[in-house]
């Protein structure tokens, strides 16, 4: 009983600290600060992913990680750096034959998600990150309480504690709340913001499921222990990473569509 109470207390304290830190970073709205902090988090998440994919850590892995993250700061398209890092790692595997083929996987997950998260901030600003946070948090909260109150149908064997009803409630709540924040970022109004928020929330659900699948596959409860009461970095950011990639893709293609429309109009 005492252990459970301590865990819950730790969970709430850690949650408050994370919210305050995230709020301060977004308030500062400084690209270098955001890049540096997110880079440190990425390094921890990458280490956790090595465990989940059962890949042995090596100098070449972390060298590629650092160089690609530095390149992302100067590159106009950060997500490209994630894909290039995966290609470089594949080349190292082929040349050295010192790594198993699974060594490429941490550069895809969580790698692509972290680069997308940085890309969302770099290309679209702090408001887009706030939008993403609102959608992901609302999806998690809605799924948790919706599942507790109305959940009856198991969602998937990958995560047996989640229910279909909870997932649907979470997605609906995230779509509605996210649309009000997204309206400030989109010129298409409420309906476009609602559609984007729905797609982000949907991907966030599958981000959580994928993390659950990886942990279940290797027989661990949490991806790490760095966050008291929460587990590891990936336990907290799994939904965010999938959501970030979907948001970045949606906003990126929206920009292309606008530019094309202007070009054709001229």
From Swiss-Prot:
EC number: 2.7.7.41
Pathway(s) served: Phospholipid metabolism; CDP-diacylglycerol biosynthesis; CDP-diacylglycerol from sn-glycerol 3-phosphate: step 3/3
Single GO molecular function: phosphatidate cytidylyltransferase activity
Membrane topology: Multi-pass membrane protein
GO term, biological process aspect, one: CDP-diacylglycerol biosynthetic process
Principal localisation: membrane
GO CC terms in record: plasma membrane
Keyword Transcription annotated: no
TM segment ranges: 16-36, 52-72, 78-98, 101-121, 125-145, 164-184, 186-206, 237-257
Cellular compartment(s): Cell inner membrane
Keywords: Cell inner membrane, Cell membrane, Lipid biosynthesis, Lipid metabolism, Membrane, Nucleotidyltransferase, Phospholipid biosynthesis, Phospholipid metabolism, Transferase, Transmembrane, Transmembrane helix
Paired cysteines (S-S): none
Keyword ATP-binding attributed: no
Reactions catalysed according to its record: a 1,2-diacyl-sn-glycero-3-phosphate + CTP + H(+) = a CDP-1,2-diacyl-sn-glycerol + diphosphate
Family as reported in the entry's similarity comment: Belongs to the CDS family.
Alphabetized PANTHER family for the sequence: PHOSPHATIDATE CYTIDYLYLTRANSFERASE 4, CHLOROPLASTIC, PHOSPHATIDATE CYTIDYLYLTRANSFERASE 5, CHLOROPLASTIC
Protein name: Phosphatidate cytidylyltransferase
The species this protein was found in: Helicobacter pylori (strain J99 / ATCC 700824) (Campylobacter pylori J99)
């Amino acid at each position: 009983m005492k252990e459970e109470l301590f865990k819950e207390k730790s969970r709430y304290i850690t949650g408050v600290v994370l919210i305050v830190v995230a709020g301060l970073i977004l308030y500062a709205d400084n690209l270098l600060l955001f890049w540096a902090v997110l880079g440190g988090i990425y390094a921890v998440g990458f280490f956790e992913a090595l465990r989940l994919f059962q890949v042995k850590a090596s100098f070449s892995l972390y060298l590629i990680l650092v160089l690609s993250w530095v390149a992302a700061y100067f590159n106009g398209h950060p997500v490209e750096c994630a894909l290039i890092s995966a290609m470089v790692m594949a080349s190292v595997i082929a040349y050295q034959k010192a790594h198993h083929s699974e060594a490429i996987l941490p550069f895809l997950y969580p790698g692509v998600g972290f680069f997308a998260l940085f890309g969302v901030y770099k290309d679209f600003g702090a408001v887009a990150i706030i939008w993403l946070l609102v959608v992901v948090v609302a999806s998690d909260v809605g799924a948790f309480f919706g599942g507790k109150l109305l959940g009856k149908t198991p969602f998937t064997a990958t995560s047996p504690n989640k229910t279909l009803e909870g997932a649907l409630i979470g997605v609906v709540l995230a779509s509605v709340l996210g649309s009000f924040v997204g309206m400030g970022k989109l010129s298409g109004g409420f309906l476009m913001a609602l559609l984007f928020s729905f797609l982000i929330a949907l991907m966030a659900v599958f981000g959580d499921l994928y993390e659950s699948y990886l942990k279940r596959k290797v027989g661990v409860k949490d991806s790490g222990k760095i966050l008291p009461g929460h587990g590891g970095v990936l336990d907290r950011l799994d939904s965010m990473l999938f959501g970030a990639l979907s948001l970045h893709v949606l906003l990126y293609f929206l920009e292309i569509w606008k530019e094309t429309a202007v070009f054709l109009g001229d």
